[in-house]
Amino acid sequence: DQEWLELEAAACDYEARLLPPFFNTLAQYVEMDNSTFACPGHQHGAFFKKHPAGRQFYDFFGENVFRADMCNADVKLGDLLIHEGSAKHAQKFAAKVFNADKTYFVLNGTSAANKVVTNALLTRGDLVLFDRNNHKSNHHGALIQAGATPVYLEAARNPFGFIGGIDECCFDEHYLRDLIREAAPEKANASRPFRLAVIQLGTYDGTVYNARQVVDKIGHLCDYILFDSAWVGYEQFIPMMADCSPLLLELTPDDPGIFVTQSVHKQQAGFSQTSQIHKKDNHLRGQARFCPHKRLNNAFMLHASTSPFYPLFAALDVNAKIHEGE
C-alpha cells in the first residue's frame, strides 16, 4: 500500500509540474465553462452552430479552440498587453528557458516583433548598422517608421546564387567609420556611433553567424544589436551551435545590449504567427543607453492587438516548456 501511495504521489507531482503557467491556467479556466457577455461574439462557438456551414466549421476545429477564444478583458488570465498574472509568469518562464532577461510573446509574427524593437530603440537622426539580408520588417521599422539613417553591411553571393554572410571587410572599424563619414559626418568619431545594429542571424539561404564574433567585432560601436532569428532559434539547444546563440553570451557593461526575435512557428513548436522577443541587457542598467521595459512595452502595445487569440499565447508557453529539457 505504501508503494502505491508513493507512486500516486509521484504521479500527481509530475502532473502538477507538467504544464507551463499560462496554458495550465487557461485549461483550468476553460474547464469552468463560465458564461461571457463580452467578446468574442461567437460565444464559445454557439453562434457558429446556428448554421450548417458554421456547424461543420465548429466540428472541424473542435470544442476547446472556441472555448479558449476569450475576451482579453477577463482578469482571470491576466492582461496580455501589460504582462500580468499567468501571462507574466509564462513570459518569465520563457525568459529563463531561453536565457534572456525578459521575454515578450508576440502574436502577429516576427514582422511585428522586429518593428517593436526598432520602434523602441530608434528615432530620426540615429544611425543603424543594417545587414543587407534583413527582412523587410526591419526596413519598415527602422528606416521608414523610426526614420533612422542606415549604414549598410554588404552581403556576399556565391556562384550558385545563394546569399551568404556579410563581407568580412564590413566588420572592420576603419571601414565602418569611413561609411559613417559619408552618411553622418558628425558621428564619425563618436565612441558608439550606432544606436542599433540589425543582423539577420540566420539567412533565408541557411547562413548562420557566430554571435560571439559579431559582438566582438562591432559590439563596441553599438548601443544594441538586434539579431533577427526568424529562421533559427534552436541554436542554443544544440551544443555544436552554442557560439551562434546571442542569448548564451556572457556580457559586460561595455558590451551592447542584445535583442533576439524568433519566429517560433518556423523552427520551434508554435502556431503560425507566434513569435517572441528576447531582451538581454541587464548589464546596461544605470547607463543612458539602456532601454527600459516601459519604453519597449509602449512600442509593443503599438503593434499588438487588443483582441489576442489565447491559443497562440498558450502555444508559446508550451514551446518554452518543451525546450526546458529534463
Please identify what each model-predicted range represents.
Residues 1-84:
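N-terminal "arm"/small-domain region of PLP-dependent enzymes with the aminotransferase-like
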Residues 1-14, 89-103, 224-242:
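Short N-terminal secondary-structure initiator segments
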